[in-house]
Amino acid sequence: MKIAVYGKGGIGKSTTSCNISIALARRGKKVLQIGCDPKHDSTFTLTGFLIPTIIDTLQSKDYHYEDVWPEDVIYKGYGEVNCVEAGGPPAGAGCGGYVVGETVKLLKELNAFYEYDVILFDVLGDVVCGGFAAPLNYADYCIIITDNGFDALFAANRIAASVREKARTHPLRLAGLVGNRTSKRDLIDKYVEACPMPVLEVLPLIEDIRVSRVKGKTLFEMAETDSSLEYVCDYYLNIADQILSQPEGIVPKEIPDRELFTLLSDFYLNININSNNLEKNESSFLII
């Protein structure tokens, strides 16, 4: 099974991906996480350091694939999750999609691409050009990370459009949304009401999720010394269980941009109007 994780930049894709990878491993699966971001920090909380990238390794070998060994590019992370960082071209040059293609090509050359139960692609930001949509060419499922905000849901809608486009020629389905670190889910619910898709999980606003990234540890590793965090791990285990059940998934039908803008902005405006009316009523009551 191959999974591509997308979402707005800074939404917490890598943190979520690492914890999902651990959860899948806890369910007895052999897991490989591939970071598809020039920052090459996707697997940081699994390995505790920035591992060398595929592109760096290939460059050091003058792109002689026969000189590259699995241990040159595949690193063992926490929980027996294997880790690879694709890397990227120099800033302002080249195509990230090409890098993803080279990564998959090399893993196939090493007979490593098909030996895992689950391969998870963690893809940078909300860039949905043909290049960074490349992991969708290999994926069975796409998971979109979002929060309860306007920008994240707007990005999710654009990613849903990419899934629909790729599903024309590939056996790809959207597994669903994962809400990350959000105190509310009303806007998420409003969106999925207008654009039907599964919501796999909504994680509450837990500060330790953010702290884990800074510490370079997954929530599962932190929970080993702090049992109060075990309930957070259950969220990721729930996501893993849903994925392993091989859900039917959907081919989403995204909302046109202007229609979505109106839907989400009207929702915000109505909330503000209701809040103002409530404040006025309370003020009137106090005056009386």
UniProtKB/Swiss-Prot annotation:
<comment type="function">
    <text>Component of the dark-operative protochlorophyllide reductase (DPOR) that uses Mg-ATP and reduced ferredoxin to reduce ring D of protochlorophyllide (Pchlide) to form chlorophyllide a (Chlide). This reaction is light-independent. The L component serves as a unique electron donor to the NB-component of the complex, and binds Mg-ATP.</text>
</comment>
<dbReference type="GO" id="GO:0016636">
    <property type="term" value="F:oxidoreductase activity, acting on the CH-CH group of donors, iron-sulfur protein as acceptor"/>
</dbReference>
<keyword id="KW-0460">Magnesium</keyword>
<protein>
    <recommendedName>
        <fullName>Light-independent protochlorophyllide reductase iron-sulfur ATP-binding protein</fullName>
        <ecNumber>1.3.7.7</ecNumber>
    </recommendedName>
</protein>
<dbReference type="InterPro" id="IPR005971">
    <property type="entry name" value="Protochlorophyllide_ATP-bd"/>
</dbReference>
<keyword id="KW-0547">Nucleotide-binding</keyword>
<keyword id="KW-0479">Metal-binding</keyword>
<dbReference type="GO" id="GO:0036068">
    <property type="term" value="P:light-independent chlorophyll biosynthetic process"/>
</dbReference>
<feature type="binding site">
    <location>
        <position position="95"/>
    </location>
    <ligand>
        <name>[4Fe-4S] cluster</name>
    </ligand>
</feature>
<dbReference type="Pfam" id="PF00142">
    <property type="entry name" value="Fer4_NifH"/>
</dbReference>
<keyword id="KW-0411">Iron-sulfur</keyword>
<keyword id="KW-0004">4Fe-4S</keyword>
<dbReference type="GO" id="GO:0046872">
    <property type="term" value="F:metal ion binding"/>
</dbReference>
<dbReference type="InterPro" id="IPR030655">
    <property type="entry name" value="NifH/chlL_CS"/>
</dbReference>
<comment type="similarity">
    <text>Belongs to the NifH/BchL/ChlL family.</text>
</comment>
<dbReference type="GO" id="GO:0051539">
    <property type="term" value="F:4 iron, 4 sulfur cluster binding"/>
</dbReference>
<feature type="binding site">
    <location>
        <begin position="180"/>
        <end position="181"/>
    </location>
    <ligand>
        <name>ATP</name>
    </ligand>
</feature>
<keyword id="KW-0602">Photosynthesis</keyword>
<feature type="binding site">
    <location>
        <position position="39"/>
    </location>
    <ligand>
        <name>ATP</name>
    </ligand>
</feature>
<dbReference type="GO" id="GO:0016730">
    <property type="term" value="F:oxidoreductase activity, acting on iron-sulfur proteins as donors"/>
</dbReference>
<keyword id="KW-0067">ATP-binding</keyword>
<dbReference type="InterPro" id="IPR000392">
    <property type="entry name" value="NifH/frxC"/>
</dbReference>
<dbReference type="GO" id="GO:0019685">
    <property type="term" value="P:photosynthesis, dark reaction"/>
</dbReference>
<keyword id="KW-0560">Oxidoreductase</keyword>
<comment type="pathway">
    <text>Porphyrin-containing compound metabolism; chlorophyll biosynthesis (light-independent).</text>
</comment>
<dbReference type="GO" id="GO:0009507">
    <property type="term" value="C:chloroplast"/>
</dbReference>
<dbReference type="InterPro" id="IPR027417">
    <property type="entry name" value="P-loop_NTPase"/>
</dbReference>
<keyword id="KW-0934">Plastid</keyword>
<feature type="binding site">
    <location>
        <position position="14"/>
    </location>
    <ligand>
        <name>Mg(2+)</name>
    </ligand>
</feature>
<keyword id="KW-0149">Chlorophyll biosynthesis</keyword>
<feature type="binding site">
    <location>
        <begin position="10"/>
        <end position="15"/>
    </location>
    <ligand>
        <name>ATP</name>
    </ligand>
</feature>
<comment type="subunit">
    <text>Homodimer. Protochlorophyllide reductase is composed of three subunits; ChlL, ChlN and ChlB.</text>
</comment>
<keyword id="KW-0408">Iron</keyword>
<keyword id="KW-0150">Chloroplast</keyword>
<feature type="binding site">
    <location>
        <position position="129"/>
    </location>
    <ligand>
        <name>[4Fe-4S] cluster</name>
    </ligand>
</feature>
<dbReference type="GO" id="GO:0005524">
    <property type="term" value="F:ATP binding"/>
</dbReference>
